[in-house]
């Protein structure tokens, strides 16, 4: 609802967002892009075009994007000419067919070349989807259902089930006070969070539960300390657990490929996204 005289000071984007909140749950498709996360009532909300590090709102105002560059996806900038040229060519040639696209083979080969520990690769569209695929594969490979996690790994039921045991379980990993409504209760006690750089917490989980999979972000807001990643790798080896590195956020930034290469610790599986497509929907496992 727009109050009296408020519309005179509001931009087109702010007005449109008020309409959106009436018909779209949360107002948009992604929490990270909601105006409430930045500057409520003043955030432009929508863009008309983007290029490099700049965006233009619906009123034509130009901004330098110093926030999150498309939630961390556009490391090469918005509208990169070489990337867009390839995409436009694909659209013109036809981007859908009963047959497969040959590029998936070339990309799989390149990812394996960059990560010699890997044997195969497959693709998805979002980080959450890639994480769900990886969890299913890892559970099958380990023969065990229980997973230890550290970090943010999407919104699928397997991950949010951590809050069925304690609604504070995902504090510091996702959001505080998150209620796992709609998540099947039979998933309770299948996922157990541990804190980054707290190897003792992970050891305790492994001793108390039949953990088959460790899934974690390689780094979060701090660097690994006291050989943390190496210790995790050794524990996984000792207990025959599958170690998965979620590199959707960290991959292709400090290193060409996964940032785990910087620390010389190899996982059994890894996910990549965001920077992998520079704004286009693709992730890999």
Region spans (language model):
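Active-site core of PLP-dependent enzymes with the aminotransferase class I/II
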Residues: 198, 204, 216-239
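Active-site PLP attachment segment
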Residues: 264-285
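Buried hydrophobic positions in well-ordered alpha/beta secondary-structure cores of metabolic enzymes
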Residues: 27, 60, 87, 111, ...
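PLP-dependent aspartate aminotransferase-fold enzymes
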Residues: 106-213
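Glycine-rich loop-to-alpha-helix module at the N-terminal edge of alpha/beta enzyme cores
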Residues: 62-144
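Short, Lys/Arg-enriched N-terminal segments with co-localized hydrophobic residues
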Residues: 1-9
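Active-site-adjacent loop/helix segments that line or gate small-molecule/cofactor pockets in enzymes
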Residues: 10-49
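Active-site and channel-lining beta-strand-loop segments
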Residues: 44-68
């Amino acid at each position: 609802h727009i109050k009296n005289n408020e519309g005179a000071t509001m931009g087109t984007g702010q007005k449109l967002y008020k309409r959106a909140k009436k018909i779209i749950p949360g107002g948009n498709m992604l929490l990270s892009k909601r105006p409430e996360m930045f500057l409520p009532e003043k955030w432009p909300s929508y863009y008309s075009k983007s290029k490099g590090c700049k965006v233009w709102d619906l009123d034509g105002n130009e901004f330098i994007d110093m926030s999150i560059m498309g939630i961390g996806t556009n490391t090469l900038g918005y509208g990169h000419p070489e990337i867009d040229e390839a995409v436009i060519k694909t659209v013109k040639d036809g981007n859908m067919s009963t047959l497969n696209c040959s590029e998936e083979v070339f990309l799989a080969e390149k990812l394996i070349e960059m990560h010699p520990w890997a044997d195969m690769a497959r693709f998805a569209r979002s980080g959450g989807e890639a994480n769900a695929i990886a969890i299913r594969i890892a559970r099958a490979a380990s023969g065990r259902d229980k997973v230890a996690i550290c970090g943010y790994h999407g919104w699928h039921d397997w991950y949010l089930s951590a809050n069925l045991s304690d609604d504070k379980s995902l504090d510091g990993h996702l959001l505080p006070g998150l209620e796992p409504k709609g998540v099947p209760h039979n998933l309770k006690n299948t996922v157990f969070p541990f804190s980054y750089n707290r190897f003792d917490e992970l050891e305790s989980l492994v001793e108390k539960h039949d953990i088959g999979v460790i899934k974690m972000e390689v780094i979060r807001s701090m660097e690994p300390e006291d050989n943390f990643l190496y210790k995790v790798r050794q524990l996984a080896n000792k207990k025959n657990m599958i170690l998965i590195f979620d590199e959707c956020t960290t991959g292709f930034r400090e290193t060409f490929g996964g940032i785990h290469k910087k620390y010389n610790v190899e996982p059994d599986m890894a996910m990549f996204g965001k920077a992998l497509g520079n704004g286009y929907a693709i992730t890999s496992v």
